[in-house]
């Protein structure tokens, strides 16, 4: 069996991997075997953290909305507000509500009061 020379193909593959790991420190950017291991590890972490980021932002939005509601000092909670929005079929998601809460607290106060009043009135009269 003859020997296969893979100089060009292997070099191209290694340089492509090295370009990915050029910003890594120490042997992680110089040794081929550790570069491949670190590349796999980096890609796994980035994939995992993309899902984590979605969770973290949702938690942040909920915290911001809840903080503004408590600061205003109204008699209802975050969960009641979200339930009322759902019942009323208002298309304001948590991200938009959090932006409104930061930029204009009075606007959020007016929105929440209107929605809570209508839902409470319908529940008390037995319409829902």
From Swiss-Prot:
Main localization, broad class: plastid
InterPro entries cross-referenced by the UniProt entry: Ribosomal_bL20, RIBOSOMAL_L20_CS, Ribosomal_protein_bL20_C
Pfam families: Ribosomal_L20
Subcellular location: Plastid, Chloroplast
Keywords per UniProt: Chloroplast, Plastid, Ribonucleoprotein, Ribosomal protein, RNA-binding, rRNA-binding
GO CC term (a single one): chloroplast
Superkingdom of source: Eukaryota
Heme found in the keyword field: no
A GO BP entry: ribosomal large subunit assembly
GO molecular function: rRNA binding; structural constituent of ribosome
Family: Belongs to the bacterial ribosomal protein bL20 family.
Stated role: Binds directly to 23S ribosomal RNA and is necessary for the in vitro assembly process of the 50S ribosomal subunit. It is not involved in the protein synthesizing functions of that subunit.
Protein name: Large ribosomal subunit protein bL20c
Organism annotation: Daucus carota (Wild carrot)
Record gene name: rpl20
């Amino acid at each position: 069996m003859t020997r296969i020379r893979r100089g060009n193909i292997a070099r191209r593959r290694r340089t492509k991997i090295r370009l990915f790991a050029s910003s890594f420190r120490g042997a992680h950017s110089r040794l081929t075997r550790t570069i491949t291991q670190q590349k796999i590890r980096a890609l796994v972490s980035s994939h995992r953290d993309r899902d984590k980021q979605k969770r973290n932002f949702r938690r942040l939005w909920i915290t911001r909305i809840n903080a503004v509601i408590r600061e205003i000092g109204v008699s209802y909670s975050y969960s009641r507000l979200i339930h009322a929005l759902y019942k009323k079929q208002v298309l304001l998601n948590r991200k938009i509500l959090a932006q409104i809460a930061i930029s204009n607290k009075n606007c959020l106060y007016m929105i929440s009061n209107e929605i809570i009043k209508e839902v409470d009135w319908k529940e008390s009269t037995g319409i829902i």
